[in-house]
């Protein structure tokens, strides 16, 4: 089974599992001293606290847990740097970085079918589900039928709000031993999943990253090479009937156009600067 099928099976059978994506932003934050004051494509700043958290999270999740998958960035040189952090590289469970992201190459074959099945399985799970994401992903709560949603800022939340987010999650989980926590909250998600795994070793923790951006906000935040109609039709069988209710959701689309995917072009970034008064 590939990683999509593994996660689907684990969720169906309530087997503890996690998936965390380590991309170029996480790499630069963790390893590049010259980038210690830099930022990723979402203008999420690299900080020492985040750097230390990412390094610890990678070590812990790959060496101390049994069913934790690491979304592997496409550049093998970056993955070699991560491998250099640990003693036993054979314990690293590398997986497809785009496990939750629908690629243009997925359309028309079983890859798309399997990914929609994964989302369907999450949606149908009766585990208590909590999402951590920015407020424009409000529709994600309907997509996966989560019990709670915790909103964080679009970027730069980790240093000041990490402990607060952990406490909020603990409050919502209550006495449950096996929660499902879904993250779409940038680089800090990796550290969040690590700490939650320590607290709830029976839990299921899934790092969606930018995967839900397009279908939930109509904003192609990463340059997916397909249209909104394409992704909407792919998800249509599991979407609620009011998915396009403008009264309920109409305000999020314009805001998403200048707050998400701002690295894709100067026009979007200029709209963003105008919005914040700079």
Specify the residue positions occupied by each region the protein language model found.
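Structural signal for conserved beta-strand scaffold positions within catalytic alpha/beta enzyme cores
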Residues: 19, 72, 150-153, 207
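Residue-level detector of flexible, active-site-proximal loop/helix-junction positions
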Residues: 77, 156, 212
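Conserved nucleotide-cofactor-binding alpha/beta core module
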Residues: 132-176
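Surface-exposed alpha-helical segments enriched in charged/polar residues
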Residues: 59, 167-170, 194
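C-terminal functional extensions of proteins
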Residues: 184, 188-278
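Electropositive, gly/pro-rich neighborhoods at or near active sites that engage anionic ligands
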Residues: 1-146, 277
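A structural signal for short coil/turn segments at secondary-structure junctions
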Residues: 65, 173-176, 200
